[in-house]
Amino acid sequence: MSGRVSPTLERSSSDGQTGETKATAQPSDSISVRDISYTVRERIGPWWNVSLYRKKWTKQILKDVSFHIESGQIMGILGNSGSGKTTLLDSISGRLGYKDNFFGEVYVNGRQLKKEQFRDCFSYVPQSDTLLSFLTIQESLTYTALLTLQKRSNDFIKKKVDAVMAELSLSHIADKIIGSRIFVGISGGERRRVSIAAQLLQDPKVMLLDEPTTGLDCLTANQIVSLLSELAHRDRIVIITIHQPRSELFRLFDKIAIMSFGEMVFCGNPMEMITFFSDCGYSCPEQSNPFDFYVDLTSVDTRSKERELETYRRVQVIVSAYKNSEIFIKELAAIERTKSVKELPPIPFKNKDSPSAFYKLWILLRRTTRNFSRDKIGIIMRLLQNLLFGFFVAFFLLRLRTDLLKGAVQDRAGLIYQCISAPPLTGTLNAVALYPPLRAISDQESKDGLYKKWQMVLAYIVHFLPFSVISVAIFSTFIYWSAGMYPEASRFGIFFAVILVSHIIGELLTLVMLGVIQNPNIVQSGVVLLNSAGVIVGSGLLSKLDKSLTLISNHFSFFQFFIFLFFIYSFIPSLGRFWKVNFAACEPNSSTAINPACMLSHGIQFIEENFPDALSQFTTNFLILYAFLPGLTIIAILSFKIRERIIGRQ
């Protein structure tokens, strides 16, 4: 991290002046930020402390931040954690959640942006890379290009992707799988370059990057910043936040901004930074990294009250010196000069040649299918997990019998109960395992304006339907015929249809919860609890409670009509074909007093006692059950609409 600064500063001075001269000669684009302030209201205490939780205090995140940057320049925003770097990027790009607490102006080419124009002007690369693990680099960029550009020829898309990969030195690893923590793929630096390449496909003139070097080794971090510097010098504006840059990067930045507690402590070229702090009485030692030295100098030490007050006063003195300096006056003059141009240049929007909603849905479906198709173990588990459960049931049950004394009724009812209760849970496991990565990438790409979140949800639903049909078909075929259920094709068809809908409903219900709850583990636990409650209400257990609990039963039994398991359990008589079964006679000389099981000699008696309306309402229950599918699909789409609002306010 350390090294002599003098030679570096000489190169920096030369490079910085060259960049400024070039930008001043013919500035095609510019960004001007004037007096940006941002506050949030936070609760004082935790939720369990009611008196403190109800109280709020106002926290200043940004305070009167101003700067100006022109095309051909790269600006690095420095500062410790909590200094306001990321919030500043969010404010520039229009991604702030609580917009009512935002004050100030953002100008592009002297024009103040409208609310809906921010997304179409700035390309934003977040700190974490959201990429699909099983795609190659070329596939990932190709699908992004298809979502970005209106329907073009394959030749055009390929040339576009190849050009971007060449620009970011990705061509030699184009066919390499991206990978994840579970299996090896590309390196961290290569992942970051893929994220940048995805943004370049939209031909942006302004690029914002949040901590692009985080988690990378020194060499890779240097390469990323060098690459961004080259991109900036190709007539782009590049603004990055950076936490601990090496001294070798000093010469690459055309402008450097230092943030502390939401205030701009300094903004200017590298040589101006050295001169400014030296004039303030804080010369950088020769063997020190100037970045580290000045960031530490402008940070507030909170280890003790005395140190906090002392360092805060020092920061305020430096801020005051900067606000009264020629450097700051020059920044404000550049902002006013840009606004006062008679013929303002147009706003440099990204490529807005977007395809139709249906075509985007088709591309998302193709990308999702291609990504999951390479996960061989995942495909096998999705197809066979229901069958594995079937093996477990068959092992204990083997064949259905007709002997009441050996549990004929319990076996039939229990088999059907297990067959229709387990598939919703396997559907939940599928959604919890597969959808969170798609949700993460849709959160990012929907912010970039590539598509809406509901389109990703719908693409996933269309994707998993064939897998659900095949998985349930394998399970149904095995368990129905191996258990010796009623040998009739129509009965098997009903059995398959009921199990299929229960499996799909389980996955759809999980999608609904994934829309509003971030943690997949909480979602899984929540769906399991809902299914458990559905078993209690839907199976008719409440209707058989003791008379002392009749009041509770009456209150909760109303909810059974909103629970899909209530309608599924109504098919137990039909699936078990009880009315066609004549149970084996009891032993001679036995009586119902000795053995109550002898009260049942025909299956119809079991139906009349436990499911009195099941047969007469068969068609109605079947239609209502399948009506849950479009209903839950619509609710899932609405839940991700809610998610869009929640994320927008974070």
Question: For the regions a protein language model found, what residue spans apply to each?
Answer:
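Topological signature of polytopic alpha-helical transporters
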Residues: M1-S66, S71-Q73, N80, F103-V108, ...
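Alpha-helical transmembrane segments and their short interhelical loops
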Residues: S226, R234, I240-T241, R246-F250, ...
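Catalytic Walker B motif of ABC-type/P-loop ATPase nucleotide-binding domains
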Residues: M207-E211, L216
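Helix-to-loop junction immediately C-terminal to a conserved catalytic motif
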Residues: I92-L96
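ABC ATPase C-loop
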Residues: Q199-L200
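Conserved catalytic motifs of ABC-family nucleotide-binding domains
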Residues: S83, K114-E116, S128-E139
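Hydrophobic alpha-helical transmembrane segments of multi-pass membrane transport proteins
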Residues: D411-I479, N531
